[in-house]
């Protein structure tokens, strides 16, 4: 099984990370919100999804799921990195990709070898090329 980092612990990131861990992968969920990470480490789940509490608790107890604010360490420890951050609407209604860009650049600065980067955020067509360019800019 793989070691996977998931950037973002909202609905998409937390549910994806917990499910990937439940399949047997080692998953490190990362968020820049220290309080959210502290609460997750205490077993306090910030969202409601049927069955999520049990999946998180089971996988934390097994050592397959962990939570941190240390993006660099999570990226260095992983083969696959999921970007699952918010993409709120911009003033013109398009997706605001600033959080995706920030995370992509953070991933690049932490890379210690080949990584598969998966954009799980809700983004427009062509964002994958932009993520690749942002990563290459930092390498």
Predicted regions and their residues:
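Rossmann-like NAD(P)(H) cofactor-binding subdomain of soluble oxidoreductases
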Residues: 89-139
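N-terminal glycine-rich phosphate-binding loop for ADP-containing cofactors
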Residues: 7-9, 19, 32, 64, ...
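Short, well-ordered coil/turn residues at beta-beta hairpins
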Residues: 77, 83-85, 120
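Hydrophobic packing residues within well-ordered alpha-helices of enzyme cores
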Residues: 40, 56, 131-135
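A structured beta-alpha segment of the ubiquitous adenosine-cofactor-binding alpha/beta core
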Residues: 52-79, 89, 108
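Short, hinge-like loop/turn segments at secondary-structure boundaries
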Residues: 45-48, 84, 135-137
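NAD(P)+-binding Rossmann beta1-loop-alpha1 motif at the extreme N-terminus of oxidoreductases
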Residues: 1-44
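Short, well-ordered alpha-helix to beta-strand connector turns
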Residues: 24, 77-78, 114
């Amino acid at each position: 099984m793989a070691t996977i980092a998931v950037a973002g612990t909202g609905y998409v990131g937390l549910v994806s990370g917990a499910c990937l861990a439940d399949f047997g992968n080692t998953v490190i969920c990362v968020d820049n919100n220290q309080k959210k990470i502290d609460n997750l480490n205490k077993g306090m789940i910030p969202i409601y999804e049927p069955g999520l509490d049990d999946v998180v608790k089971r996988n934390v107890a097994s050592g397959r799921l962990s939570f941190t604010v240390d993006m660099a360490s999570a990226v260095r420890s992983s083969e696959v990195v999921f970007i699952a951050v918010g993409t709120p609407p911009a003033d013109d209604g398009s997706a605001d990709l600033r959080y995706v860009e920030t995370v992509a650049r953070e991933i690049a600065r932490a890379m210690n070898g080949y990584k598969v980067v998966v954009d799980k955020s809700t983004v427009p067509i062509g964002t994958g090329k932009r993520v690749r360019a942002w990563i290459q800019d930092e390498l």
